[in-house]
Every structure is written in structure tokens, then in C-alpha cells.
């Protein structure tokens, strides 16, 4: 992982074999980011995506292995009880078969590169579990 700090936030590059979620958590911890938004593109070969069932109030994981383009990775970074909390969604596509998958990013290993922008915001937003929804919602 290599990154550079700018006035608005950070620009990060991941290389083959690096995992997105663990790398972003490491950056957020090192730089003490409290609140941010994430956008990225790249390529991965091992991706686990969660799809939330609103009826069951739980995620169902699906793993995809092979060559996938990351056409969109978006989300946010906040703190929950002082710890980094990432909420990331990803859209991946197989350039050969045309299949596309999207959902909550659980993990993804880079196959070529990832180009990520982390915009940092002043202030703090927390998360609190909602029994009604079954998710950790923004707490202002």
C-alpha cells in the first residue's frame, strides 16, 4: 500500500495480493481519520460480497474468484465506539462473461491495482444498532 496525503484527504494505491478492507483500516488507524468518504476502481481476483436480507436482518456472503474489474467501490469511514468502521459497497464485473455482482464489500484481494480516494470530513458521526432495521445506522 502506498498513499499520499492532500488537503482534502488521501490518494491510495494497492498492489497485487493486498486486501482492500484491511489496508483501508490500517490507513484510517495510522492517520486517525474520523469521518470520510471512499471512491475507488481497480481489479480483484478474490472478492466476498454480502447481501443484506431485510426480512432475516442478516447478511448472506457470496465469494467470487477469478478476474474481476472493480467498476465501482463507494462508501464511508466513521468511528463506532472509537474504532474504525467501514461501510463499503462494491460492483464487480467479469470482462469475459459479462457477469456483474454488487453488494456490501466484506473482503477483496487485488489482482492488478486499486486506485482509491479517501475524502476526509471535519467532525464525527457514530453508528448505533437499530433493532427495527437490523443494521448499525448513523448516529448524529
Where are each of the predicted segments found?
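N-terminal intrinsically disordered, cationic/polar leader segments
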Residues: 1-86, 91-140
